[in-house]
A protein has these predicted regions:
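N-terminal, active-site-proximal structural segment of metallo-dependent hydrolase catalytic domains
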Residues: 2-49, 60, 65
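Structured beta-strand-rich core segments of catalytic domains in phosphoester-bond hydrolases
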Residues: 40, 46-99
């Protein structure tokens, strides 16, 4: 029997959350896949050290708005960003990983 732990968390701003114990929780849970929503950051604003995990981020074009990230222990076969609908894909709301 194969078991996997999958966590999804709407952090409502990862930069503030990172200063309030996010990394401790992340490490303690030891999830196989950890997804976060509402990262509300732009590329380069924060780097999270997650040894043993592959990181995938989708940033919103609008500063301080939406955004998603996935951390996974197993490297996916493929990764895609967005829905293929331009008006929605600017919000960084969707990341699809295929295993």
């Amino acid at each position: 029997e194969t078991k996997m732990k999958f966590i999804s968390w709407n952090v409502n701003g990862i930069r503030a959350c990172a200063g309030k114990g996010f990394m401790d929780f992340f490490q303690e849970t030891d999830a196989d896949i950890f997804c976060i929503q509402e990262t509300k950051m732009q590329e380069g604003q924060l780097e999270l050290d997650t040894p043993g995990y592959h990181q995938y981020w989708n940033y919103a074009k609008k500063k301080g708005y939406s955004g998603t990230a996935i951390f996974t222990k197993q490297e996916p076969i493929s990764v895609s960003y967005g829905l293929g609908i331009e008006e929605h894909d600017q919000e960084g709301r969707v990341i699809t990983l295929e295993f």
